[in-house]
Amino acid sequence: MLRGLPEATVIRDPSDWAPFLRDESHVRGVAPLAVVKPHGPSALRELVRRAKAEGFGLVPRGAGTGKAGGCVPTDRTVVVDFSAWPGEIVVSPQDLCLHAPASALLRDVKAAAETHRLFYPPDPNSWESCALGGTLATNAGGPNACKYGMTRHWVLSLDALLEDGEIHTFGISSVKANAGPALGQLFIGSEGIFGFILGATLRLTPLPREFVTLLLPVKHWEDLLDLPGRLCGAGFLPSAFEFFDPAVLAELRAHGPDEARRLPGEALAILEFDERGCTSESFLEGLLDLLGPVADGLEVAADVRQRQGIWAVRRMTSVFLQERHPGKVSEDIVVPRSRLREFFEGLDQLRIPAVTYGHLGDGNLHVNLLAAGATEPAHLDHQLVELFRLALSLGGTLSGEHGIGLAKRDAFLALSDPAHLHTLRALKQALDPQNIFNPGKVI
């Protein structure tokens, strides 16, 4: 299989394929035909040619940190592992941008920007280990999306492999580019079904010079639900607004690390602000006035060490719950800030055994069904569909940042607007008529 492929390492031994059959979701893939690590464009050109001639598909893979099964192999596919794709991170401070290959780790992208006192905001929970290409293909989010938006808001241009086997660049290194539709945006969040992302030019902004990190414990957890809308309505836009519901907080206190065992409240929020003046007394006084009695237990991180400790607990929550409940299923639905209370009231009425934490500030909630592994599959599917229907009924969506992949494909197809699906299929047919790019995913 794939003999004589130029500029590539081909892994043919099935005993070496295990790491490539999964990501961080519950989805498991089938054995691929091979795993290929391309080192240059001639490898991709030949891969595309052979895929079209021999009738197999190509599955892109970055660091394997996805949450929806988007990078796992399906029938008659070759995994294309971009971890060794060449390229350097090049920062242009004058243009407030940088260019990086898909193989670059997001932590290195962010660090390169920060050496010039610049900031690349997207910060998914896996930011220290995920690859840039994967964050582009899934339109990754994270806590900072509350203020700064998703990955797609920070992409100026994109390098993509198309079905002709060539690498094409869409966009320029400027915030202004209006010569027709922004075709590069089609690839962001497409999970590789239109073509493969090989690199991108990313927009940067000056690095925030001030931070204030706040712990907000509450005696009655419903008191948190109106706060995102109240804060935004009063002109307080946090750069992050995270939360733990009572069940998650209880698990952390009972079984988590020492930092988690000391967390106060029935439920808890983490708020962070990074605007100029946010550390001033007047800013904090205005915030306290707005919060009112809810802020009785408010704690301000005293220094960088305490701030890092707070965020360490938040960042480890997903792994902690996975270790405690190996069969759990984690969803990432979204509802508008103004309808958070309605969502949780509806969730109670559905009687779905779930715990929640995540990005309260932008309505992106990680709803975890801890007993999913012990639940009859048909009943679990019913619970998930009911959860998705609830989010959709409130003007939300079934995925805020993880994507569709294989994990949510059936629900996505069942619940989406037919016109939406028709348009996606038309785009797929136009850009990938032989269905070689990540077949079986999303649609």
Regions found by a protein language model. Name each.
Residues R12-W17, L21-D23, P206, V212-E386, ...:
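C-terminal substrate-recognition/cap domain of FAD-linked oxidoreductases
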Residues E166, R409-I443:
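Activity-critical C-terminal alpha-helical subdomain
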Residues T397-I404, P439-G440:
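Short acidic/histidine-rich active-site segments
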Residues M1-R49, T65-L96, N125, V248-D258, ...:
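N-terminal flexible segment immediately upstream of the FAD-binding catalytic core
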Residues G87-V91, L98-E242, F437:
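FAD-binding subdomain of flavoenzyme oxidoreductases
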